[in-house]
Curated annotation (Swiss-Prot):
GO terms for molecular function: pyrroloquinoline-quinone synthase activity. Gene3D superfamilies: Heme oxygenase-like. It is an enzyme of class 1 (oxidoreductase). This is Pyrroloquinoline-quinone synthase. It catalyses: 6-(2-amino-2-carboxyethyl)-7,8-dioxo-1,2,3,4,7,8-hexahydroquinoline-2,4-dicarboxylate + 3 O2 = pyrroloquinoline quinone + 2 H2O2 + 2 H2O + H(+). Its EC number is 1.3.3.11. It comes from the Bacteria. It holds the Pfam family TENA_THI-4. Signal peptide: none annotated. Belongs to the PqqC family.
Length: 251
């Protein structure tokens, strides 16, 4: 087997972008939502479970900043936290997602309670936050490079959902519109970090594996939702139709 060679920055960027072939936009659950084939329950289930991911993004970014000794990087990275938590001029992405939840017919208190979060989704998201806390900050930061592929997925929802799901209130689409510009800005910074840090074969190959880890997380979340909302096989479905799984917040 041929040993991998050191890639130029251009080749390494191309290798990172090539991982977009495994982005969760190609998961059957996402394809169904895009094509107008998802049921109301499937849309609501996705919004409710994805909300858990949204609420953990600022925790992930705070962990990266806590491990980062470089003030210039922290000054840029903190914007990601503000984007989600909000600031004087913006309610933030988490509030925008709550409005999406309301637009698809969910009560915001139900979303905030996390009672609809499936164990498989919780485990996947928690693994991401745990990695960000334990990894060297450059690796944790670059695990966010799935943002390379995010603008396309946000735009696809804006293009297809109003047509396919007229029952979703227009106010719910604010999150996707806001992330179009934010994601492109974040990609530029994250890509700069990756290209500067990955200056050896070992670092380049490890970063590709880290990006795959993040792709695995996103795909696994949709696998859990598929079991629950498409195949009607939520956890413990063979013994009860009640959501008896743990609700988190154990530590």
């Amino acid at each position: 087997m041929t040993e991998p060679a050191l890639m130029t920055p251009q080749q390494f960027e191309q290798a990172l972008r090539a991982r977009g072939a495994y982005y969760h936009i190609y998961h059957p659950y996402h394809i169904a939502m895009h094509n107008g084939e998802a049921t109301r329950e499937q849309i609501q289930g996705w919004v409710a479970n994805r909300f858990y991911y949204q609420t953990r993004i600022p925790l992930k970014d705070a962990a990266i900043m806590a491990n980062c000794p470089d003030a210039a990087t922290r000054r840029k990275w903190v914007q990601r936290i503000l984007d989600h938590d909000g600031h004087d001029d913006s309610d933030g992405g988490i509030e925008a997602w709550l409005r999406l939840g309301e637009a698809v017919g969910l009560d915001r208190e139900v979303l905030l309670s996390e009672q609809l979060v499936l164990p498989g989704v919780r485990f996947a998201v928690d693994a991401y936050v745990s990695f960000a806390r334990r990894a060297v900050w450059q690796e944790a930061a670059c695990s966010s490079l799935t943002e390379l592929f995010a603008p396309e997925i946000h735009q696809s929802r804006l293009d297809s959902w109003p047509q396919h799901y007229p029952w979703i209130e227009e106010e719910g689409y604010g999150y996707f519109r806001g992330r179009l510009g934010q994601a492109r800005r974040d990609v530029e910074h994250g890509l700069q970090l990756a290209l500067a840090y990955c200056n050896s074969v070992e670092k380049q190959q490890r970063m590709l594996e880290i990006l795959q880890f993040k792709l695995d997380i996103l795909w696994s979340m949709l696998d859990a939702m598929t079991m629950a909302y498409t195949l009607n096989r939520a956890p413990y479905h063979t013994v009860t139709d009640q959501p008896v799984w743990h609700q988190g917040k154990l530590l």
